[in-house]
Amino acid sequence: MPEEHEHNFVVSQENWSLHRKGYQDQQRHSDKVKDAIKNNLPDLVSEENIIMSNGRDVVKIPIRSLDEYKIRYNYEKSKHVGQGDGESEVGDVVARDPNASQQGQQGQGNGKKAGDQPGTDFYESEVSIAEIEEALFQELELPNLKQKDEVEITTEKIEFNDVRKKGLMGNVDKKRTILTALKRNAREGKAQITPIYNDDLRFKTWNEIIKRDSKAVVIAMMDTSASMGTFEKYMARSFFFWMNRFLRTKYDTVEFEFIAHHTEAKVVSEEDFFSKGESGGTICSSAYHKALEVIDEKFNPRSYNIYPFHFSDGENISSDNATCIDLVHEIMEKSNMFGYGEVNGYNRYSTLMNAYKNIEDPKFKHYILKEKADVYHAMKSFFHKQPEKV
């Protein structure tokens, strides 16, 4: 007597292409938003609404309108038609009057003079912090990350990397289910997909990824002296804001120490580091002494990848510069990299940068920030992603 199967499944033969129009429009809009984010990253990274909201806000960016292709009347009223000269390229406007720009009477307004032609339609789309992070963080990584004393950790991410015969219907693997049914039916002499039985069902299942990873610590040092004005402090905090989010998003075992300094340095909380201001003179070596103290007390270089970052306006007491250079070299002996960012929007003479420009150690990286967009460029400079080795 042939074995009976419970037959509860069918394969839909409906033409699903009829239902894809909305999805295609949505995907096209999503692609345009991603392009707009990528093209506006330098401005978005320094957007004050995001920095001051602690990452819980959205911003609006302009996105070019997506017009459907259609034939329309030529409002520019070109008087001639004929064969092209073969030099046209994708994106060229067809049938535009070549003399229009010379006549000075047509064209879009440029902000100084009025024009009589329609402009390009733009609309504003809200962008969340997560979308900006996705575009920014894929370009970055911790430099010179080395394998230290290993710590086994379980990542929060799960991967669907196994297939089983039992599972949740929401996780059914349609492709493998159909292949299983097709093979079984073929063995029975019927080269077709249906019928599909319970025994043919295959389900995707997941596993938590266990990996061995090295620990890292970032020592963030910021000049909070009186010479650090509103713009300088905003730029420094903007950089540290994105650095903080980047490292905590991409790495599981990164720790942070925050040091604020004027003539004296002290370890502060993350909240105080990003919110409180101080005054006084500037002795940058005080921050480096404190960083070495923190490293010696808490972070053994054999167990930690150490990344000190210092942001200042460069207005240091000249007599302190030689001490700073010696301490920077001492810190680099214990760290993977030393990053120095200087906020100098007016191209003024900087005593500290003048001293640091002679440091030739490859571990030493510096960047001068002159405008808000440089926060993005500084991030890319310090956390430049190395090409994968083939």
Swiss-Prot record:
Pfam families cross-referenced by the UniProt entry: DUF444
Ranges annotated as spanning the membrane: none
Region named Disordered: 99-121
Xref: InterPro entries: Spore_YhbH, UPF0229
Family: Belongs to the UPF0229 family.
Record's protein name: UPF0229 protein OB2647
Organism: Oceanobacillus iheyensis (strain DSM 14371 / CIP 107618 / JCM 11309 / KCTC 3954 / HTE831)
Lineage: Bacteria, Bacillati, Bacillota, Bacilli, Bacillales
